[in-house]
């Protein structure tokens, strides 16, 4: 097979969760899969943003989904199978953040975050895997350097994002993204026999689309070997690679796209 053909996703059906925000990782994922030839569904609870994003990509389909509602997750997979007859690629990108959560946040908030993020990830993966068992497929979990490393206080100094060293980012986010890494390995170990590959992509913060960097962006960038945050196309190549035949022998892997941040 020609190497360029290995990166083609023609004939594949993909689902990207949380792709409605043009400033987020999901937008890059959806755009990359679409450009590589896949039929792409995007799902989020904000249909206005989803529709606005999809309008720029003829044929891209939108589905409303709230991570906190199990029935929504079942509906998304069912609708894709009903309309397209298959599902080949799942990108678990959606996340419900516990904003500015402190060390002493109420346990109800912590539990709600786990339900929306960890539990939803598990259910989406399970349902997608069932849909993929006949033909195989690729599941890609969008992680973070926060799932690999402890809190780097230098990123947040004098940004207004931190109080007493533990205000931001959320401890629940670190907990969930760290768990995502090992869940990826576990899922890969049980789904390999069905030719379903499961991988993770761990990223750093995104550059602002308008180019207006704040103190956080400047400090975060200075901690990378390439001197910047993740650009609006830096994720696309990795996603297409993990989604298609180019990575046929790659599973249980964490692809780190961080400009060398974790190498220091």
Language model regions located:
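Short, small/polar-rich loop/turn modules that mediate ligand/substrate recognition or access, typified
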Residues: 192-197, 250-252
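Short C-terminal tail/terminal secondary-structure segment
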Residues: 2-5, 24, 158-161, 240, ...
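Conserved NAD(P)H cofactor-binding loop of Rossmann-fold oxidoreductase domains
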Residues: 93-98, 205, 260
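Substrate-binding pocket helix/loop in short-chain dehydrogenase/reductase
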Residues: 101-111, 153, 220
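Catalytic loop of short-chain dehydrogenase/reductase
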Residues: 140-193, 205-207
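Alpha-helical segment proximal to the catalytic Tyr-Lys
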Residues: 130, 189-190, 248
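Canonical Rossmann dinucleotide-binding motif of NAD(H)/NADP(H)-dependent dehydrogenases/reductases
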Residues: 8-41, 187
